[in-house]
């Protein structure tokens, strides 16, 4: 359970010296009682449910969680007041078709029905046949909030279930591929032990340094700059930080890659980036030690950045 915050890559957390991520990799819950979901590349994010402060049904974007400029839509008139263009058109349909539940949910919008090919963001999804439903939503998060959406607590969602008839009529296609992890963890456990040894040699940077290092690492990934030891030494020198911290970051990133290879997805929807077949954007995995996104940054993040520049 976490506040409604941005999900981190596991390797980025290690930069501050937080070694609980190694417990996250190493926990038996990763393979047994974890909550694993496929990360879908939809847009925009849609939040809907019952507003705890009014008791009314609402839809919105992530702006429903804003501390100041809050945009909660409890009617079509609210949507017209708070939003314009394509986002408003999407929210009008979501207001009509999403289930009016007592809870609070979030999912990514994939598209309107009537086609078999959708590109809401970077990845293009090819469905096996034309979608007959009115809207397509990829649900991923359920929230609890006692009195105000600004205090909402996020919980990862398992298989979706609603009590009304939206699962059997043509209102909503819930796009939620099922993912499993192979129980072959010995190599990951050994590499986590090695990472702990490396951590004993590290002088970890402060919060401001970590933020700057993360931006520079993202820039390298997006611009296809190889993160070899020469690049890491340059980053360490520029940020006046211990080179061993960046070597540890790279090691943890490679452990995450090993984890990715153990995850399988069972779904008949094909994924492409431009003309090249690809896997899903990644996964979100939760256990007793935290919730992290497991994404192939060298593949997806670079493509996402480059396609965003072209639009």
Language-model region placement:
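Core nucleotide-handling region used for phosphoryl-transfer chemistry
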Residues: 1-34, 39-44, 48-311
């Amino acid at each position: 359970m976490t506040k409604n915050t941005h999900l981190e890559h596991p390797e980025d957390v290690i930069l501050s010296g937080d070694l609980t991520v190694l417990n996250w990799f190493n926990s038996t819950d990763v393979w047994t009682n974890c909550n694993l979901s496929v990360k879908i590349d939809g847009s925009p994010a849609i939040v809907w449910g019952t507003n705890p402060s009014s008791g009314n049904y609402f839809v919105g974007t992530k702006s429903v969680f804003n501390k100041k400029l809050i945009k909660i839509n409890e009617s079509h008139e609210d949507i017209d007041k708070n939003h314009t263009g394509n986002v408003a058109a999407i929210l009008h349909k979501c207001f009509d078709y999403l289930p009016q539940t007592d809870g609070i949910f979030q999912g990514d919008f994939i598209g309107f029905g009537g086609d078999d090919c959708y590109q809401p963001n970077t990845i293009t999804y090819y469905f096996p046949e034309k979608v007959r439903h009115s809207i397509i939503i990829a649900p991923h998060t359920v929230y609890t909030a006692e009195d105000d959406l600004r205090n909402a607590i996020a919980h990862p969602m398992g298989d979706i279930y609603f009590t009304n008839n939206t699962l059997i009529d043509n209102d909503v296609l819930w796009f939620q591929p099922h993912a499993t992890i192979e129980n072959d963890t010995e190599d990951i456990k050994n590499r986590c032990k090695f990472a702990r040894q490396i951590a004993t040699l590290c002088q970890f940077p402060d919060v401001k340094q970590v933020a700057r290092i993360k931006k520079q690492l993202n820039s390298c990934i997006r611009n296809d700059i190889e993160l070899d030891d020469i690049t890491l030494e340059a980053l360490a020198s520029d940020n006046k930080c211990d080179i061993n911290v960046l070597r540890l970051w790279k090691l943890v990133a490679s452990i995450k890659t090993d984890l990715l290879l153990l995850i399988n997805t069972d779904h008949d929807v094909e994924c492409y980036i431009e003309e090249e077949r690809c896997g899903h954007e990644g996964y979100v995995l939760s256990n007793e030690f935290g919730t992290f996104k497991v994404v192939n940054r060298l593949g997806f993040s670079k493509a996402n950045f480059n396609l965003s520049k072209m639009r």
